[in-house]
């Protein structure tokens, strides 16, 4: 990485590419009007060092649901998921090592800040929190964003029809529904589906209901 005068524990960015320039230092364009790359480090961190890591759009999605019934009981479960995608952990960007100046503003931070690199904690892989000379988004905060979410689980019971005939009722069903009970993912932020600058995750809900048919 070409980042002179860095202090121990500061965030380092790799210099991977550069632009071809003429004798006056002006970038050379190809026949399509785009900058030509040297394919090797040039001692400058700029747009030439940007690389395409992936996309937040899923490579493929899936959904699965089923209803199980036994006598008067019924159980419905629905799952869905997204795969082959990357997510930028903006929550860590805002509430972790890169915004420690917010401590002076009395804001809260993620617990991982306690494991920042320091002279007494040299085995940590986390930056020291000292203001860096390159405060731009990087691959350090990119994570696998695949997930499988259980959207809802509904459990119900229908009163036997032979009992309802005596009171002239067509159907009575009681049920309980749990929305968004859990999600399976390797993403370390709040929610791989909604996370942006500590945005609210998908809420969990509880519902109880009664279906009556006359």
Please report, for each region that a protein language model flagged, where it lies by residue:
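Extracytoplasmic gating/loop element in the C-terminal half of outer-membrane beta-barrel translocons
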Residues: 5-6, 10, 26, 82-174, ...
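Outer-membrane beta-barrel pore domains and translocons
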Residues: 69, 80-82, 177-181, 213
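Membrane-embedded beta-strand positions of outer-membrane beta-barrel proteins
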Residues: 77, 174-176, 210
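Conserved small-residue
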Residues: 1-56
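Repeated loop/turn-to-beta-strand initiation elements of outer-membrane beta-barrel proteins
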Residues: 72-77, 162-163
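C-terminal beta-signal and terminal closure region of outer-membrane beta-barrel proteins
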Residues: 1-10, 100, 113-116, 135, ...
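Membrane-embedded beta-strand positions in outer-membrane beta-barrel channels/transporters
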Residues: 63-65, 152-156, 207-209
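Outer-envelope beta-barrel architecture signal
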Residues: 60, 71-73, 146, 168-172, ...
């Amino acid at each position: 990485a070409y980042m002179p005068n860095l202090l121990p524990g500061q965030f380092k960015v790799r210099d991977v590419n550069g632009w071809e320039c003429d004798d006056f230092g002006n970038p050379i364009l190809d026949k399509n009007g785009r900058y030509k790359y040297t394919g090797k480090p040039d001692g400058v961190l700029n747009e030439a060092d940007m690389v395409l890591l992936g996309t937040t759009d899923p490579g493929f999605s899936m959904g699965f649901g089923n209803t199980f019934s036994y006598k008067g009981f019924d159980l419905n479960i629905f799952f869905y998921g997204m795969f082959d995608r990357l997510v930028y952990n903006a929550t860590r960007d805002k509430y972790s090592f890169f915004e420690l100046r917010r401590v002076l503003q009395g804001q809260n931070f993620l617990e991982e800040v306690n494991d920042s690199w320091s002279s007494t904690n040299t085995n940590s892989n986390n930056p020291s929190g000292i203001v860096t000379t390159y405060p731009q988004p990087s691959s350090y905060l990119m994570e696998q964003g695949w997930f499988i979410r259980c959207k809802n689980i509904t459990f119900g019971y229908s009163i036997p029809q032979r009992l309802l005939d005596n009171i002239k009722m067509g159907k009575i069903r009681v049920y309980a529904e749990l929305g968004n009970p859990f999600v399976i993912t390797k993403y370390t932020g709040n929610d791989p589906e909604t996370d942006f600058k500590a945005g609210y995750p998908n809420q969990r809900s509880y519902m109880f209901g009664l279906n009556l048919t006359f």
